[in-house]
Structure formats: C-alpha cells, structure tokens
Amino acid sequence: MAAAPSGKTWIDVQKKTFTGWANNYLKERILKIEDLATSLEDGVLLINLLEIISSKKILKYNKAPKIRMQKIENNNMAVNFIKSEGLKLVGIGAEDIVDSQLKLILGLIWTLILRYQIQMSESDNSPKAALLEWVRKQVAPYKVVVNNFTDSWCDGRVLSALTDSLKPGVREMSTLTGDAVQDIDRSMDIALEEYEIPKIMDANDMNSLPDELSVITYVSYFRDYALNKEKRDADALAALEKKRRETSDASKVEVYGPGVEGGFVNKSADFHIKAVNYYGEPLANGGEGFTVSVVGADGVEVPCKLVDNKNGIYDASYTATVPQDYTVVVQLDDVHCKDSPYNVKIDGSDAQHSNAYGPGLEGGKVGVPAAFKIQGRNKDGETVTQGGDDFTVKVQSPEGPVDAQIKDNGDGSYDVEYKPTKGGDHTVEVFLRGEPLAQGPTEVKILNSDSQNSYCDGPGFEKAQAKRPTEFTIHSVGADNKPCAAGGDPFQVSISGPHPVNVGITDNDDGTYTVAYTPEQPGDYEIQVTLNDEAIKDIPKSIHIKPAADPEKSYAEGPGLDGGECFQPSKFKIHAVDPDGVHRTDGGDGFVVTIEGPAPVDPVMVDNGDGTYDVEFEPKEAGDYVINLTLDGDNVNGFPKTVTVKPAPSAEHSYAEGEGLVKVFDNAPAEFTIFAVDTKGVARTDGGDPFEVAINGPDGLVVDAKVTDNNDGTYGVVYDAPVEGNYNVNVTLRGNPIKNMPIDVKCIEGANGEDSSFGSFTFTVAAKNKKGEVKTYGGDKFEVSITGPAEEITLDAIDNQDGTYTAAYSLVGNGRFSTGVKLNGKHIEGSPFKQVLGNPGKKNPEVKSFTTTRTAN
C-alpha cells in the first residue's frame, strides 16, 4: 500500500467520499455541498437530501434560516425524520450539526448510506460480507485476489476487473499501465461513462489510504448497477418497444408528393411526410422532430414550410423561384429519412429560350388593345407546360410607359395585352425574373388610324385625265370613329391599270395625307389604299382615266382673237377636244397661253371644269400681238395668231357738243354729238367704243337716250325731255365721265305758234323810309311773285342801289295772272296786281297755275 499523502487522514477521505455521495443526489435539485462540516449547518441541504433519498416530503421547514434557533429547528426536523425512518442515531443532535461536528456528521451520513445505498444496518455484518463475496465472483475470471475493502484495492487491478466484468471489453486488463493511481482513475472514468457511477472518491485515496467505509460506499454502486441491470435491460427493452411503437423510424418514414419529384418555379411544391414506426405501422399522432431543408444548385436555400397536422401526416411546401436542381433533405431528429436527400428538378422558363410573338408585336392602333403571347421554354428549349413564371412586360411609347396586362394561361403560355393611347413607335420588351428575353426589345408601329374607318375623297378619287396631274386626300380616322389629328401612319397607295402610274403620298401631319399622281394613258384603273396591308373604307376604288385633249382637235374662239384695244379686256374661249373629236366635259388640261407684243401681257385662264377655258388679257399699248396657245408643249390648231390692238378711247380726252347740251324744249328732240379721242389725244376714226349716256330729269325722271355709232369716231345722241325743268346729262366711257361731264341742261316749254300769247313787262318801285322820304340807296329785300298758268315765264328782281327796285318778266300762254310785290316782307301799295294775258278761254288745259318768285337781296 502506498504511503498516505502528507497530513491526510481517513476523516478527509470519508469527508470527500460522503460529500460526493450526497451531491450525487442533490444535483437533481441543483444543490451542492461544498464543505460537509459547514454546508449542513442550516439544515436546508440535509432536509433536501433526506427528501430525495427517501422520496418523502418534510413539510414546514425554514428555507432561509438566519438565526441559530431557526437552524437548530431545521436540523431537529431532519434528525426526527431520520429516527422516524427507523434509523438509530447515537451521540448526535441538531446542535452538533449546527456546530459543524464533522465526525458526528460523518457518522450521520454513513447511517444514511447504509440504509439507502447499501441497505443494511450498522450492526448487521452479513451485507458487507455479501458485498465482498459478490465482488469476488465478479472478478474471479480476471485472476485477481480481493480479501477486503481496504488494501485489496490499492493497485487498481480489482477495480479494473470489476469495471470490465459488468460490460466485458470496456476495461481490458491488458491495457493496465502498472501505475496504480492512473489505472484506478481510468477505471473510475469508465465506470462513470458506462454505468453512470459517480466518482465520489479520488484515485489517490483508494491507492494510498483506502478507507473501508468509503470503498464500500463506492463499490456498492457497482453491485446496484449489476443487480439493476436486468431491470434496466427490461426497462430499456420496454422503452425501446414503446419507442418503436409510438415514434417514427427514419428508415421507415414515407415521404411523397410532387415536391420531392419535380416542380415548377413560382408554384408551391408540396409533399407530405407520413410518420411510420419501426414495424411499418402509420402513426396517428404528431409532435415528432421532422426537419426539412431545400437548397438549390446555386447554393441558395429556399424556405420550406412544415405543418404538423397532429395526425401523423406532416405537410411541407416550398416555392422555388429559379429553375434548377434542388436538394430536399428530410430528417427525423437529425437522421435522414428513407431515400433522403431527394434530387428534385424544378422546371421553369429560361430567358434565353422563351419567346414572345403575336400581332401586338407587329403593329397596333390607338385605342385598340394590342395582344401578343409569351411562350415559356426551359433551358433545353423544351416547351414549358405549366404556368407560374415571373414574366414582366415593359411597353414604352413616345410619351411614356404604357400599362400591360399579363394573363397566365397555366400551360406555359401567357397572354399579354396593352392599349396604346398615342400613335408612333413603341418599344415592347419581355423580361423573365428581371432578365430580358434573348429576342430583345421589339419596335412596334402604333397607328393613329383604323383601316375600317379611314377613307378617301377628292377629285383624283372620282375621275382623272391622262397626262393631267390630279390628287385626292386620305382621311385617317381612329377606332373610336374620331378623325385623327396627327400623322405618321404608313398608308400605302397603288394605282393599277393598263399602264403604270407613279403615286406620291404627302403626310400633312394633321391626320390627312395627300395622294398625287399623273396617269399617262387613258383606261380603267383601280386605286388601292391600305394600312398595314388592310384595305381602308371603300377600297378598292375603280376609276376611269379619260383621254387627254388633242392639240390638233382642240381650238379657241372669241373676240379677243380678232382684235382689241388698249386697257380693255380681250377675251376668248378654249375648247378641249380629245383625239376622237369628242369635246371634253371636264377640266384639268395642260393648256398654256402666251402673248407677246409691244408691251408685256399676262393672260388669265380659267378652267371651267367642263372642257372649256376662258382666257382674258388686257393690253396696255396698241400694236400687233402674237397669241400662242399650246397643249402640253404642242401648238393648238390655228396658233400662233396675230391680233391688232388699237389705242383705246380716252374718257379724259373724249368730249360732246351740241344744242342738246345747252337748251332744250319740252316739245322738240334734243341732240348732241360725242367725239371719241384716244389716249394720245388723237381723234378716233372708227367706231365701236362703249360710250354710255345717262339723263336724269326733274323728280327722278329717267330719260332714254339713243346713241348712234357713226363709225367715224363720232356718236350721235338724241333724247326727248318731256317736261320742263333741269336735266342732268352724263356721258361715260367704261364708267368714267368724258370731258366736262356731267352737265346740267334746262328744258323749257316749247311755244305753240297758233295758241300762245306773249307779254313782256317791266316796272320800277321807289322805296321810301318811315318819314315818307324817297330812299337814295338800296339793300332792301325786294321780292316779286307771279302766279298763273304760264307756259313759259322769265322773271328778274333787281336792286338798282339807288333806292329803286325793278321787276322784269315775260309770259307765254293764255290765262289770268297775279303779281305780288313786297319790300322787306310787306306788300307795296296795290299789291298783288291782277292781269290777263291773251285769251283765257284758250288756256292750255295741261298747264296748271303755279307761282314763280325772285328776290333781290
């Protein structure tokens, strides 16, 4: 036996061993004795130890004693409990425990060990012998000698043999090192690992100072393990059977469903875990430790939801967003379930192989939904047959983004629709999970117009003539039947017929398009107008192209081709005739008129639209002029033609003379002569000038004048003035009065030689002032009035400026007359005066009595 460590006694060994024994129980309440002598002082740890080893409760003890009395009370309760268990305590009381009497405390603990660990009383020696005999039988095969519980254990061989005997192979004797302490310590470690025997004493203590009670206490654990092994095995077998019956076996668990077979992106991949026990029986309860993980080939883990249905079925689901291979791991308590891990292919469309197509990528119209289709294809180029892919569509118009709607058809195809609001070039691009399709963006022409609503009008749409330019207008109309206000639509126009026709289209940028063409040959033609290969309204349109006018058959006639005069419009008419001699009935011919002469002339030609053309020109100088008429560059029959232009009569230089412009009588024709003089002041010697005579008489009377062209530059004028009075005579040339016009002419009653009487009278009045004195100066108002049926009368009132006033008058006719004379508004003495002229019985019944008045001053 090795020497005991310096200063260490059996008390120290027992203290450590018994402390370890007690702490092995106290640990279940997370309690611990630090020093056996002092830790039991308050009675709390001792009471807890007693409750644990006896499986009984000690009630109403002080759990936090502060004073000695409370500690003694607790320990009294502990001592009394030990006695109540039938144990006899000698020489120890509560005060001894409070006062830390170690030897007495060791005796107390040994009493507890005997009862609850070794199950024997202190006076009974047979259990000790029985324990020794049990050890001998256990280690007999190992050829080791054990005679006691002291020095037989010093070299560690007995302990090593005992350790291996409970489970052969765990402590091979051949592995002993010969170092007793090391071998003992290793055996204690194995006993702890394999049999859960607490290491309540040190290897040094067993080697150098083997305290019998300590060794017995420690070795008793081995016998307990051996005696309880059968029960433990039975319990373990029962527990195993229970586990096999009531819990799942990872190797038998069934995992099934599309989520472990294959799936599609963005669609829930579901599968189920069926709890199955060791015997292959399905379990109907939940709560087991299944775990699921899903990791893609790119190393990214996909969240997986696991739901315990509490009926033995667990529902798992995950949604992959990237098409690739995934590893699905299903474990039960960190053990792979049957067939786990699973290699699952999640299919989905690939941006490099998917494509978009349809009319919405080829063109569209404002206000009309434009549709196209997306077809998903996987990385192998195979058509995808399920929906759920994350396709997005971006539509950009000249004015900004346009909303696009995507419908997932569930079969790998997607219907896309967008509704343009403005015409012009649009860009449409399709993305898959943010990546553009390989086909890239598509440029789409969006039209303002709708082919079914757009239409044409204009002359060139109804009729045309060979070799004549013509045109018509395309009116673009939207799908809403409203006229378009913007251009840019690709209308196509063609005209087919016997001969090719070149067509030009001008976009007016206002929703209209001008179509111009010049057919070279006549015949029946067809107009085609299309928009994106669709015919517009009323198309095709048949049109007959008439023959062009023939310069050999066409002709001109009119006075302007015979001659003219300066400053006067000369006119003639062109008649368009086709090669068959048929007069054309519409316009548009290429006639051109040129005139050359002494002065420039700009002829004006008007297309009457009926096959005739009116030409008018006004020469400014006299002389010979050459008129040329061409049709498409060829001279018309009879041209060129020379015409003579005479000097024009001048209103400024022309004049009129004659008695009819001086004095006329109501009973005789009045005559005068117009003398035509040209602009150079030369008297004209021929006629034809458009002189006009206008004569207006009293009271709005209009008198007709007869003008006779003497064809020698003079024009005779005769008119009758039917009543007396003033007449206004005006002679004009082309609206302009001739020299000294207009002129006033007085018409008087003409005398009848058989019936008329004549009287001439004169008298003088001498004026006096208020004093009756004759005045010697004039200035008074002298008024003379004659009333009667005069056929002709002249009357003058004269202030002689010497205080006398003279009245002079003459009368023609028959009848009674009255003459009134006033000075300053008052009749002179005897006024009015009565007189008779001729024979009143012969008075002209058509002459009525009237008053004539004259005033001086």
Curated annotation (Swiss-Prot):
- Select a single GO molecular function from the record's annotations and give it: protein kinase B binding
- Give the source's domain of life in one word: Eukaryota
Supply one GO CC term from the record: anterior cell cortex
Residues bearing the modification Blocked amino end (Met): M1
Entry keywords, A to Z: Actin-binding, Repeat
Q: Which SMART domains match?
A: CH (SM00033), IG_FLMN (SM00557)
Q: Which GO terms describe its biological process?
A: actin crosslink formation; actin cytoskeleton organization; cell migration; cell motility; chemotaxis to cAMP; hyperosmotic response; lamellipodium assembly; phagocytosis
> Which PROSITE patterns does the UniProt record give?
ACTININ_1, ACTININ_2, CH, FILAMIN_REPEAT
User: Where would one find the signal peptide in this protein?
Assistant: none
The segments labelled Regulatory site in the record are 229-246
Show the segment(s) annotated as Actin-binding.
1-250
Q: Where are the Filamin repeats?
A: 245-346, 347-446, 447-545, 546-645, 646-747, 763-837
Q: Where is the Calponin-homology (CH) domain?
A: 12-117, 125-227
Spell out the PANTHER family in the cross-references: FILAMIN-A, JITTERBUG, ISOFORM N
- How is the quaternary structure described? Homodimer.
- What is the protein name stated in its UniProt record? Gelation factor
State the species of origin. Answer: Dictyostelium discoideum
Originating gene: abpC
